[in-house]
Amino acid sequence: MSRFCCFGAGCSEFSGHASTSSGKGKGIQGQVKVSYGFYLVRGMTNHPMEDYHVAELAEEKGNELGLFAIFDGHLGDTVPAYLQKNLFANILNEEEFLTQPDRAIIKAYEKTDQAILSHTPDLGQGGSTAVTAILLNGRKLWVANVGDSRAVLLKGGRPIQMSTDHDPNVERSAIENRGGFVSNMPGDVPRVCGQLAVSRAFGDRNLKSLLKSEPDIKVEDIDYTAELLVLASDGLWKVMNNQEVVDVAKRFKDPQAAAKQLTAEALKRDSKDDISCVVVRFRM
């Protein structure tokens, strides 16, 4: 049976057996016209789709918000599904959200992770990355992330990486200080205790003593030089660099078409993982 899932002005049809899903929407925040589109493709794997997204224009206490996210799950889809439903709500419910957004985001990430861990019997032993972008009144963009899902802003004609790839090798010292290790097997990526390919994530109860869910956060002004934002799971970033991604995306006025083309290009480059992509365009 199909179900309809609408985000802001966009609407997409999802089917339990479908290998793709897509949608788009648009609105105005202050002087900025915002349009967005998303496209998701299930990878060449035996498990169900583990990538989830959010793409929505909303209003909170008289403020106009753009809420965009990618959640890339592992060992099941229960944790990314939980994040899709709860993470932004938890951020917006923080009293400090409008006065100290950075602090509110960090607190909400931690509270959400604790809630996931407390629901382990229901949510299982899996986990998820997260990259979240909040556009406030068309003027400020906050991006936070844990894991290797990435956000890149095209501004002033150049790509600005708004997220941090949490690589086990980079955080090796912290992992070892907590009693863990990082494996580097030939032909494989670095992994925490030979298992997880990221050093920060939601969930992952069995590795939680070695992992953090504290996000890195970056803030940028959105002005006339800001053209577009791309959020995607590592199914895209494993085979395309930041410059290549924005070069493809900027060719399309329709952000949904841009997202679809990016996933097609990743598949052409032999990406086997789930691929999820959200493209947001800004126009003054």
Swiss-Prot record:
Domain of life: Eukaryota
Binding sites annotated in the UniProt record for Mn(2+) 2: D72, D234, D273
Family annotation (InterPro entries): PP2C, PPM-type-like_dom_sf, PPM-type_phosphatase-like_dom
Presence of the UniProt keyword Chaperone in the record: no
EC numbers on record: 3.1.3.16
Enzyme class: hydrolase
UniProt entry keywords in alphabetical sequence: Hydrolase, Magnesium, Manganese, Metal-binding, Protein phosphatase
Co-factor requirement: Mg(2+); Mn(2+)
Cofactor notes: Binds 2 magnesium or manganese ions per subunit.
Catalysed transformations (reactions): O-phospho-L-seryl-[protein] + H2O = L-seryl-[protein] + phosphate; O-phospho-L-threonyl-[protein] + H2O = L-threonyl-[protein] + phosphate
GO MF, one example: metal ion binding
UniProt entry tagged with the keyword Ligase: no
Residue ranges annotated for the PPM-type phosphatase domain, each copy included: 35-282
GO biological process, alphabetically ordered: signal transduction
Pfam family of the protein (one): PP2C
Residues given in the record as Mn(2+) 1 binding sites: D72, G73
Gene3D superfamilies registered for this protein in UniProt: PPM-type phosphatase domain
Family: Belongs to the PP2C family.
Protein known as: Probable protein phosphatase 2C 41
Lineage: Eukaryota, Viridiplantae, Streptophyta, Embryophyta, Tracheophyta
